[in-house]
Design a protein with these regions (language model features):
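Catalytic machinery of carbohydrate-active enzymes
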Residues: 1-238
């Protein structure tokens, strides 16, 4: 059986939120699944070691409607590409009629999807839970875990000189949109609070958008900025 899961939200955090649901589908159907995701989700950088995912297919369509899968002719290209995979089932984690039609025209026999046209005020986690419970009787808890190769973990420890005498904390300070970004002051208060109790070292993970760099620089310029290391120049798997 060949199974496709479509998760078209753009952020890394979005991908992490949906990961337990994708893994639950794989375990329920007893087969690794292929996922159709945007490049901005960075799935290729942190899901390559996931045994529940067999292939990562790029959805080349961003929030500005650019890319080879955008528009009418882009949809035709995507239909052709998906048809070649010969998928038996598809799970669509959104309420878009577009993806339902694409899956049907790609000759996918069984297509499961959120109720159409119900995107407004849709709770990202509850909608996914209700979807899988209703369609395939799955109860899934929202407890994402990212499984990494132990060798990569040991390499990172050596590269960044992790010390057992310090608490190493990774902070995701970026965001894929303005409404998803937390002010620098919130992180600064957290960093100051932690350092009042323990000797900590902070790694600041973010992108390179202007707003994200502004948050990064404010944190680095704070009282405990010297205990922070920026990671915006690295990929997730680095």
């Amino acid at each position: 059986m060949k199974v496709l899961v479509i998760q078209n939200r753009m952020g890394i955090g979005d991908m992490v939120i949906f990961l337990p649901f994708i893994e639950a589908i794989s375990k329920k159907l007893k087969t690794p699944v292929s996922i159709l995701v945007k490049e901005s989700s960075k799935s290729r950088e942190f899901l390559n070691d996931n045994k529940n995912i067999s292939e990562i297919i790029d959805l080349e369509r961003d929030n500005k409607n650019k890319g080879k899968h955008d528009g009418f002719f882009g949809s035709l290209k995507l239909i052709k590409e998906l048809k070649d995979y010969k998928f038996d089932k598809a799970f669509i984690f959104n309420s878009s009629l577009r993806f339902f039609v694409i899956c049907k025209l790609a000759r996918i026999k069984k297509v499961y999807q959120y109720p159409l046209f119900e995107k407004k005020n849709q709770h990202i986690i509850k909608a996914a839970q209700e979807f899988l419970n209703k369609k395939i009787k799955l109860d899934v808890e929202s407890k994402p875990e990212i499984n990494l190769d132990i060798n990569k973990i040991n390499e990172a420890k050596q590269k960044y000189n992790f010390s057992s005498s310090k608490i190493n904390i990774l902070l995701g300070i970026g965001g894929s949109g303005k409404t998803k970004r937390i002010p620098a002051e919130t992180f600064i208060k957290f960093i100051d609070h932690c350092n009042n109790f323990k000797d900590c070292r902070f790694f600041l993970a973010t992108g390179n958008h202007e707003e994200e760099l502004e948050i990064l620089n404010k944190i680095l310029g704070s009282a405990n900025g010297g205990k922070c290391e920026k990671l915006n120049h690295l990929k997730i798997n680095e």
